[in-house]
Amino acid sequence: MSAPVFDPATYDAQLAEKQQRLIELLAPFAAPEPEVFDSPREHYRLRAEFRLWREDGQRHYAMFAPGDKHTPILLDDFPIASLRINELMPRLRAAWRASEALSFKLFQVEFLTTLAGDALITLAYHRPLDEAWQAAAEKLASELNVSLVGRSRGQRLVIGRDYVEEELTVAGRRFRYRQPEGAFTQPNGAVCEKMLGWAYEALGERDDDLLELYCGNGNFTLPLATRVRRVLATEISKTSVNAALANLADNGVNNVELVRLSAEELTQALNEVRPFRRLAGIDLKSYDFGSVFVDPPRAGMDPDTCELTRRFERILYISCNPETLAANIAQLSDTHQVTRCALFDQFPYTHHMEAGVLLERR
């Protein structure tokens, strides 16, 4: 993880620059003015990863400037990280400095927290973890009131749980999420909640079905499922699928069918190119899909998946890379038009931005 340049005094100007960049990217498609959802200026990031750097005989939290992996920036705190992470950082450092079992060949620390106050710490080592480590880790987890995961090559030891629990409110309803260690979660919880609210409103109340690609742990699935008759959701990561199934059950959402397929495989299934055993018992022809929701990786949708979305009246698209979003819109622009768009400032003080668009059939 690279160290961002943190300067709250520049926040508004940076956000205005991102807004202008998004307007320019979407200008060829006659998109409306984007709705802008800002971020807290500090303590917004719910996860953080630090290398450990030895100096003066002690290990320090360290990050690196972009493009420079050799000159560490030593840290005592991290203002963009959640208050919980900042509270844990000095206490964890004191613990490893007082314990050879915890510090020996420790090279990386990852924090995962939630708006609900839950926390998990992952400690990565260049050595096998033994009983002495386990005893020290159990004591530390109790003292810090966290779960701990110890990792070394071929080894993963869990003290407590291997996930954190989050609560997000959408349209007055609170949704509970399990967020597994090592799986993708939105880093900016406050902005994530705004994204969920925007997507919920943009989709609207429907009496037909929704197809969701790249559903992850069900982050969007839970609130969007309350807007439609049924949802067919796909995800390729087994860890994320298991988390999504648990989240659906925990929230009493029972109108979602979840299948472990890639977007490309689902395209083949819908086009009847080939059958998939993982779709056994699911009658694809029974669905009356009116909308598709996509939240693809930075590369965007591949051309075949993009063509698949063309079949739908409404395409609700969340993008972590507006450049590939624009390329996908260009492919769809002869049949669909952008009727709503939004900028979500997930990553303050960086050039990265998250965008959302609603495309509707012309």
Swiss-Prot record:
The keyword Transmembrane helix does not apply. S-adenosyl-L-methionine binds at Q186, Y214, N219, E235, D295. InterPro entries: MeTrfase_TrmA_AS, MeTrfase_TrmA_CS, SAM-dependent_MTases_sf, TrmA_MeTrfase, U5_MeTrfase_fam. Gene3D superfamilies: 2.40.50.1070, Vaccinia Virus protein VP39 (3.40.50.150). GO terms for cellular component: cytosol. It comes from the Bacteria. The keyword Nucleus does not apply. One of its GO terms (biological process) is tRNA methylation. CDD domains: AdoMet_MTases. Its EC number is 2.1.1.-, 2.1.1.35. Keywords: Methyltransferase, S-adenosyl-L-methionine, Transferase, tRNA processing. Belongs to the class I-like SAM-binding methyltransferase superfamily. RNA M5U methyltransferase family. TrmA subfamily. This is tRNA/tmRNA (uracil-C(5))-methyltransferase. It comes from Ectopseudomonas mendocina (strain ymp) (Pseudomonas mendocina). The lineage of its organism: Bacteria, Pseudomonadati, Pseudomonadota, Gammaproteobacteria, Pseudomonadales. The gene is trmA.
